[in-house]
Amino acid sequence: MRGALRMAAVLTMVPISLVGSTASGSPSSQQEGPKIYISADFEGVTGVVTGEQLGPDGFEYARFREFMTGEVLAAIEGARAAGAGEILVSDSHGNGQNLLIDRFGEDVKIVRSWPRALTMMEGIDDSFDGAIFIGYHAGTTNPEGVRAHTMSSATLTDIRINDYSSNETIWNAAVAGNFGVPVIMVSGDDATAAEAKARLGDIETAVVKWAHSFHSATTLTPKAGQAVIRQTAERAVRRLLAGEIDPYLVQTPVAITVRFKHYQPSQILAYLQMFERIDAHAVRYNAADMEEATRTLVFLRNYRADITP
């Protein structure tokens, strides 16, 4: 991983015309630059305020897929302007099939659909140099934030890593940190940015809207939001190259507490010795690290005896 950073530091001294890229992330000579993982959610995308933008049944979904795709492309363009090389994108919202993959350059790979052992961070490993989170949102215990939730608004009311309440930004940053990869940038609303900085420190954040409530915000236009993301991604990669951002590390072994909306999941999970039922709605389990913690969380959230095919 650090070898790529050393090479990228050399590349950043080469004129941009020699290592340039396009907004579509088209093939270039930048593959020796820092390797970047982009996890893309949807709730934090510019203009998103309700479910009408977030899934195939929403009347605005088709249009907002364009905006989500545009924000990821803007992040790629900014990262490449700073010397980034290989990029892997994780389509991490809903059905995992939101991004318009024909808009991306041939040198960008995209993780799609489910299930995935590492969920929103599938494919990350210690070969990556930095991670960028696009379209993220605040956590379920935050009274502020557009569409604030953690993992599942339908089934979960809290997830805790050791002794603190987590959200998707923090959880996924901890997964990245498990492999020594720092999160260098998060985009979303102002509540998301505040949560990220409170736990991850002085990372780059791109605020594209300001929350009034769960379903209301003052928002930038898509073009303006993409411009902010492009500029922030470029700055984030330059700071990565300068060694200014460290991985987010959690104490291991890690204790995970999962709180459900209803009582029966905790009751049934407690039949297994690895889960301790701590009250009517919550279970706790221990894991060696965040990779194991995530695999276990994926299981307890998704397993059903009637899963098909």
What are these regions (language model features)?
Residues M1-A9:
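Bacterial N-terminal signal peptides that target proteins for export
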Residues A8-V19:
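Bacterial N-terminal signal peptides
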Residues E106-I124:
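A glycine-rich helix N-cap at a beta->alpha junction
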Residues S153-F179, G188-A191:
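Active-site glycine-rich loop that binds ribose-phosphate moieties when present
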Residues V175-V183, S187-V237:
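Active-site rim beta-loop-alpha module in soluble metabolic enzymes
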Residues Q31-G51:
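Mature N-terminal segment immediately following signal peptide/propeptide cleavage
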